[in-house]
Each structure stands twice: as C-alpha cells, then as structure tokens.
Amino acid sequence: MRCFRKLVPLIVLLLLWWLASSLSVRQGQETGDGVGQPATAYRLIPTPWETGREGARLASTGELCRHLSLTVFRGMCGLVLGLAIALILGVPCGLLRPVMEVLSPLVTAMQSCPPIIWISFLLVWAGIGNVVPMLVVFAAVFPPCFLNVAQGVAGLDHRLLEMTRVYRVPRGRVLRQIVLPGISRFAVASLSFALGITWKVTATAEFFGAPSGVGERIYWSQREMNMPRLFAWTAVIIAVGVALELGVVQPLREALDPEKGGGDSDRS
C-alpha cells in the first residue's frame, strides 16, 4: 500500500502530461501549392511515450552517456574547486576576525551575482569550452560554503584554542582534533547545498557556453524545435537532480538533524 501511495504522484503527473500533450496539437502550414497536401499536425508538448522513445534512442546511440558524463565531470570539477578553496580560506578567516571583516563583503558581493553574469564575463574572457561551466559552478558554490566554514570556525571555543597555543600543541593535531570536528556540521551543510545547486548551474552554463553536455543539447533541441528531444533531455536533468536530492542531499541533511538521529537510536 505504501509503495502504491508513492506511485500515485507519478501516475497523476503522467496523466496530466498526456492530457496537456493532447491539448497542445497545432495545425501546421500547408506545403507546396496546397492541393492534395493537407497541413500536418504537430504537438507543442510530446507525449510521455514519444519522450521515452527519444530517450531510449539517445541511450542506445551513446549520445546520452557521452553528454551526461561531460556535464557530470564539469560540475564535479567546479564543485571540488569551490569546496576546497572555501575550506582553505574559510578556516584562517574564521580564526582571524580582521581578515574576515575585510573578505566578507567581497564574498557577499560575489554571492549576489546571478550565474548569468558570470557566464557573460567568462564567455568574453575564456570563450566557449569547459572553462565556463566549471568556473560558473565555482562562483556559485564558493561564497556560501566559504561563509559557512568561516562561521563554523568563528564559533569554536577560542579559550580551548588559546590553550593549545600555550601548551604548543602541533597545528596539525589542532586542525585534526579540534577545528575539523568543530566545523563538520557546517562543512556537511555546505556540501549539501553545493550538491543541490551544482547540477542546475552546470546545465545552465552549458546552455550558453559549452560545445557539448546536457545543457548544450537542450540549446540545440529548442533551436531545432525538436520537442521530443527537448523533453527527453529535460527528463534527464530532472532525473539526475532527483537522484542527487534523494541519494545524497537528503541523507546529508538527516545526518545534521540530531533530533532525528536521536530518535532512531532510541527506537533501536
């Protein structure tokens, strides 16, 4: 019964999709002299069957795997770069308040820029290629993650850190046993947010500034008015986004919820 309830939204979505497709039929223009050549009908919204058939064709030809792997690669490169630099800069900035006061407005301004601004700049500076999606993802991921990590470090017990300096505890040990455990909650929250936004930003950047990838395929599908293909690639983006949300982001958020974790342990 529970499994059926989970399938109900999907069934309703497919039925509404099919209904919208039936209502979107338009009559095309006549060809030639119009004699004996009736105008052909076309759909603005393809049926689920047409979309699935086009998706199967993309998978069988290898086009789906090729472009999807490129999108994932670019997104992961930008994600890793953004998280790494956020961690490297966030820790010292959280410990040094004057440095944080100087950098915080700059990072906040960077965070305020929408992805389309970075895409425009990078298309001029770097041209179409892998650089644009990677750096756009970095620009979207770095600011919130940096501020999150710096906030976590600033919230550490500074008296304990002062004791480590007095007793000359090695910095590597302080980092491993005090700093990293203390900011783990903030780091996991940053990773959860970054994973959620990376996929969307990567596809958007590819739409404008990449020679390949899922976003680039969407661009050409809409240019060619190939609606089944456009919907098929859209379904790919949604499927990967849902998989990331359910398989990675939600478990990370649940790991950050002490009440839920406590409840599970009590029941066990």
Predicted regions and their residues:
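Generic hydrophobic transmembrane alpha-helix motif, especially the helices
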Residues: T108-P144, Q151-G152
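Short cytoplasmic-facing helical segments at TM-TM junctions of multi-pass membrane proteins
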Residues: N148-S190, V214, I218
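Transmembrane alpha-helices
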Residues: L135-A139, R171-A205, F231-A232, V236-I237
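Transmembrane-helix boundary motif in ABC transporter permease subunits
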Residues: C77-V107
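Hydrophobic alpha-helical elements at and bordering transmembrane segments
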Residues: L64-L68, V72, M76, V102-M110, ...
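C-terminal transmembrane helix and the adjacent membrane-cytosol boundary/short C-terminal tail
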Residues: A154, F231-S268
